[in-house]
Amino acid sequence: WAVFAILVLGTALGIRLAYDRDSYEILAYDDLIRHERYQEVIRRAEKYQPPTPISACSVNFSLFMNGQLPARMPEFYQCGTQGLVLPSIRDNVSDLTSAELLWMMGMPNITLQYYFDSMESIENGRLSGRFLSRMADCNLVNGWYGPAEKYLDLLSHSLFYRKSALRRKEMVRNEAAVDADPVYAYVRSVRFRDDFITGYDHLDLMMSILYNQNSSNFMAAEYFNAWQRLKQMEGMR
């Protein structure tokens, strides 16, 4: 019995040591955000939040989606402006929340770059349906129908994305159909009017431009204000 007890205790301890809570939480945040369950991200962070930029980015995005970013940002872990939008990191997790919020804010070109980098980081060289799907969206919004069609052709042969891909293939080279889609129409209405990509260091300037060209882009305004606030906090340290 003593040997058995030691084995049980050792197994339990090994499982506990192997459990990386921070990584688990970050993956949980990603899954919840993917399914638009932002309040659950906040609830988890209220109990425990990993002290990492990826975590801060996910929680801040969830706060914004619940209309709580300005009021509640100080309650959670912050790490400067990287906690709002991460610079592109070539792995298959770090860029995802940043890419999604930049898509919603009206920066499909940078979103496309982030997802391309994420795809390139997959070690076995396989394609991700999730990444391809958003890359197709970015190309449709921009009117770049050749690449969009290529990505949608690939997705049309997949199990989980086939139906959506076939629906979107009908929009290729059909401006009226793209404009009739509420998500695409919104992103088109708030995106940059001029086609350019700039560096991470100028993201706050890009947010300002987005808001000035379309004052209904509340997300750009709120993220710009939060960016300046965090820069001031960094300067005081």
Language-model segments: residues:
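Outer-membrane pore/translocation modules
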Residues: R191-S208
